[in-house]
Swiss-Prot record:
Keywords: Amino-acid transport, ATP-binding, Cell inner membrane, Cell membrane, Membrane, Nucleotide-binding, Translocase, Transport
Organism: Chlamydia caviae (strain ATCC VR-813 / DSM 19441 / 03DC25 / GPIC)
Gene that encodes it: metN
Taxon lineage: Bacteria, Pseudomonadati, Chlamydiota, Chlamydiia, Chlamydiales
Main EC class the enzyme belongs to: translocase
UniProt name for this protein: Methionine import ATP-binding protein MetN
Pfam families registered for this protein in UniProt: ABC_tran, NIL
Subcellular location: Cell inner membrane
Bilayer disposition of the protein: Peripheral membrane protein
Function: Part of the ABC transporter complex MetNIQ involved in methionine import. Responsible for energy coupling to the transport system.
Length: 341
């Protein structure tokens, strides 16, 4: 339905002002079919406002937005809210379940709204499929008050996907969940993307979730784009101090370690297969340098291991440069955090 080489979401020069306060400032980006696109930033950076603009719940002051063939600049007659909601589903942190309806009745509601002529048997089949996918079938006749937080959020996902949308807009949907429920929900979102190709825009302050899900990430700061690119590149080689802070990279090590003479503090980024190779120990054995590992981590980015180390590299300048050249040739990304004295 939507060609892979053309954006399913296009945002061009979007601004949003309330009174004299600019909430969004010249935002432009594209999301292609089948991507999971992350939006991160500190509180008040404009993330949720931007997502509501994508759902046409909020109108930008200026700029154009296209989502799944619908455009903010077209007339209301062209942009039927009901037709839009069949293609684009919005999931919020609050879940928004009807407390007086069972799980089944909550999920049935959008189907009856979008497909009034659908047979009862087909409705039940589609709801059961959604419940099976989310491991909720046994809770089919339960009321929301009898569900855990993770189960409620999965019901909200079932409500969103039962009408077969092409885009999911997710606003902080894991922020109130415990770690196990968060992992369960993110596994289901990733499976939706892999098996059904559903494009997702994922707003979150939980960086571990963004690492796991998102192939592209937009970093926002004070209503503007701070940085935009593949999530693993933002992790391995952030260009902005805001991005570095959000990804919890090296702020602690930079502040507490005072390096000596003939020593420099480096951050080493290991992409894909490099993350599991023991090249550091080999480097120490082969060269006239010493390495003190200050901190490090290995993360899975959409099931691919990526890692970083913060090290103190000691030795003569010539030997340090040789060591860095070897690492660079092997594909390691190096950033100098503190220079030699």
């Amino acid at each position: 339905m939507f060609e892979k080489n053309f954006p399913i979401i296009s945002v061009q020069k979007v601004n949003k002002e309330i009174g004299n306060h600019r909430i969004l400032n010249d935002i432009s980006f594209s999301v292609f079919p089948g991507e999971i696109f992350g939006i991160i930033g500190h509180s008040g950076s404009g993330k949720s406002t931007l997502l509501r603009c994508l759902d046409f719940l909020v109108s930008p002051t200026s700029g154009s937005i296209s989502v799944a063939g619908f455009h903010n600049l077209h007339s209301d007659k062209t942009n039927s809210r009901l037709a839009f909601a069949k293609r684009v589903a919005y999931i919020s942190q609050s879940c928004g379940l009807f407390s007086a309806k069972t799980v089944f009745e909550n999920i049935v509601y959008p189907l009856k709204l979008h497909y009034p002529d659908m047979t009862k048997s087909l409705i039940e089949e589609k709801v059961d499929n959604a419940l099976d996918f989310l491991n909720l079938y046994e809770r089919k006749h339960a009321y929301p008050s009898r569900l855990s937080g993770g189960q409620k959020q999965k019901v909200a996902i079932a409500i969103a996907i039962v009408s077969d949308p092409v885009v999911l807009l997710c606003d902080e949907i894991t922020s109130a969940l415990d770690p196990r429920s968060t992992e369960d929900v993110t596994d289901k979102l990733l499976k939706l993307n892999e098996e059904r190709g559903i494009t997702q825009v994922f707003v979150s302050h939980e960086i571990e979730v963004v690492k796991k899900l998102c192939c592209q990430t937009l970093v926002m700061h004070q209503g503007a784009i701070e940085e935009l690119g593949p999530t693993e590149k933002l992790f391995l080689n952030p260009r902005s101090s805001i991005t570095e802070e959000l990804f919890h990279m090296n702020s602690i090590a930079k502040g507490i370690y005072n390096h000596g003479e003939n020593e420099e503090i480096l951050r080493l980024g290991f992409s894909q297969g490099l993350a599991v190779q023991g090249m550091i120990s080999k480097l120490i054995q082969d060269g006239q340098i010493s390495i003190n590992i200050l901190s490090g981590d290995i993360n899975l980015f959409r099931k691919v291991p990526l890692g970083f180390l913060i090290i103190a590299l000691s030795g003569d300048k010539e030997e340090r440069e040789k060591a860095k050249d070897i690492l660079i040739k092997k594909g390691v990304i190096i950033q100098q955090l503190q220079k030699t004295k």
